[in-house]
Amino acid sequence: LLDRHGPGRVVFRNTRSAMSGFPKRVAHLVPLATENAPSTWRKQAERELAFDLGDMEAVERYNLTKDPRIVWLGQLLEELGEAKVLLICRSTEKVLSIERALARQVPVKAGVFHEDLTLVQRDRNAAWFAEQDGARLLICSEIGSEGRNFQFAHHLVLFDLPLNPELLEQRIGRL
């Protein structure tokens, strides 16, 4: 039980409370309203999770056009002005769907960062995001939650939550 839900093999030596100079982290939990009945939204969420976990055919594509998370994200980007936002989600397919759905809603300079890009293209997109006048939003698949640090980003959006708590820590640790 401890290995599954506790720190297990992860040791937390350098926590924010033990080190100085880090800004305080504030979690913003946002309940989202949906046009559909709760049962319809629940079915959509279950299908999305099944697809993310590889339980459904790759033929089924995400359709996030009317997803309340996209509506909220568009509003958030408008409210934040020029602040840099890092968004992390589970899969390449979801990254591309978020990019398409968001482009229909709000004009924003957004880069993508996922497994199907070459290493050079990922580096270019990360560099564009790092530039002062570059992308305001970087939409990453799970590959963006490991290895790279985006400390210059002002906000982190977790479009979905990983089932593994260590992966959640990895995502949060990008900023």
Predicted features and spans:
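Conserved helicase motor "Helicase C" RecA-like lobe of SF1/SF2 P-loop NTPases
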Residues: 89-114
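Inter-lobe coupling linker of SF2 helicases/translocases
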Residues: 1-56, 68, 75, 80-82
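A short beta-strand element within the Helicase C-terminal
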Residues: 148-161
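Conserved helicase core region in the C-terminal RecA-like lobe
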Residues: 93, 137-144, 161-163
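Phosphate- and divalent-cation-binding pockets in alpha/beta enzyme and binding domains
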Residues: 94-98, 149, 167
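Conserved SF2 helicase motif VI
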Residues: 164-175
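Conserved helicase ATPase core of P-loop NTP-dependent helicases/translocases
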Residues: 108-142
